[in-house]
């Protein structure tokens, strides 16, 4: 069929068809979505059955998945508004198709091509963080991917702070939900790596959750918590100091200091004591004669 139409392949044929195929799908998603303002204006109007939204979302996701880099970048103006409409839909199934669509977009489009839409996309991700359990894994997955894709070179971006704060606040309200914590601990690593030292601003909530989860009765949670604690300490540990060489060769003392550090955090759960501990450690190391270990 593609050859008969003069196209080199199916992908090229779908690219040509997108401008005609996507707008009707978006219209169905919009008409079946929940919007108070639209409901006031559409009293007495005939809306498509909700099943039409499911079909439209799956059709859009399939069409999108057939177009890859670099052709997809030229269609951002068309596909991103439709994916946002799916993401804002009331139906979990439609939302999931929107999330899958955005993951495909993020993997096949340059960050510069997403720059015009990044605020709207990340805002939609934040609004979907309090999603149902069935969608939580997808929510975290797409939020982490889009956040690191669009803000990768800017750890000072307010979006890092907002997205992580939303996630931590939501997890704080459901600390015993095993599925949510395991999914979050599994997927959040790239955000930690991108934020680096700016994780300090989130230590109060972060370590509060870590020390609740470290006592969980499932081994997977405990192992994931230990991995994330190791990542956080590695990213925020004192480095490039003239005094670090004085204890670099004392592995036992280093481990003991790390042990005391974790005990202090668990006992106090206080950001102020944590910062005070770092300052005390710094001045303790500074005052040591050269060649002696910190004890």
PLM segments and residue spans:
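Eukaryotic acidic, Ser/Thr-rich intrinsically disordered low-complexity regions
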Residues: 133, 258-295
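Alpha-solenoid helical repeat scaffolds
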Residues: 66, 107-112, 148-153, 193-194, ...
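HEAT-repeat alpha-solenoid elements in large eukaryotic scaffold proteins
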Residues: 1-4, 46-64, 79-82, 93-105, ...
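Helix-rich alpha-solenoid scaffolding regions
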Residues: 1-5, 10, 14, 21, ...
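Eukaryotic alpha-helical scaffold "rod" segments
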Residues: 14, 18-70, 83, 149-157, ...
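Short coil/turn segments at helix-helix junctions and helix-capping linkers
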Residues: 12, 43-52, 70, 82-97, ...
């Amino acid at each position: 069929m593609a050859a008969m139409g003069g196209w080199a392949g199916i992908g090229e044929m779908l690219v040509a068809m997108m401008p005609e195929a996507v707008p009707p799908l978006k219209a169905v998603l919009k008409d079946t979505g929940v919007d108070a303002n639209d409901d006031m204006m559409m009293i007495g109007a005939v809306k498509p059955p909700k099943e039409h939204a499911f079909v439209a979302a799956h059709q859009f996701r399939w069409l999108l998945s057939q177009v890859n880099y670099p052709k997809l970048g030229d269609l951002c103006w068309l596909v991103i508004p439709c994916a946002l409409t799916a993401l804002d839909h009331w139906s979990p199934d439609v939302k999931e198709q929107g999330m899958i669509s955005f993951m495909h977009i993020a993997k096949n489009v340059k960050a510069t091509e997403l720059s015009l839409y990044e605020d709207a996309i990340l805002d939609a991700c934040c609004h979907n963080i309090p999603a149902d359990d069935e969608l939580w894994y997808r929510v975290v997955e797409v939020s982490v991917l889009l956040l690191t894709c669009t803000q990768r070179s800017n750890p000072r971006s307010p979006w890092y702070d907002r997205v992580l704060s939303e996630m931590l606040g939501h997890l704080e309200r459901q600390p015993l939900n095993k599925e949510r914590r395991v999914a979050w601990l599994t997927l959040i690593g790239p955000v930690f790596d991108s934020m680096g030292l700016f994780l300090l601003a989130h230590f109060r909530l972060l370590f509060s959750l870590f020390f609740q989860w470290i006592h969980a009765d499932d081994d997977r949670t405990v192992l994931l918590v230990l991995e994330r604690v190791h990542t956080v300490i590695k990213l925020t540990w004192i480095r490039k100091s003239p005094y670090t060489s004085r204890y670099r060769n004392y592995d036992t003392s280093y481990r003991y200091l790390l042990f005391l550090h974790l005990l202090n955090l668990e006992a106090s759960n206080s950001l102020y004591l944590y910062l005070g501990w770092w300052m005390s450690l710094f001045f303790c190391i500074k005052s040591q004669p050269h060649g002696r270990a910190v004890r």
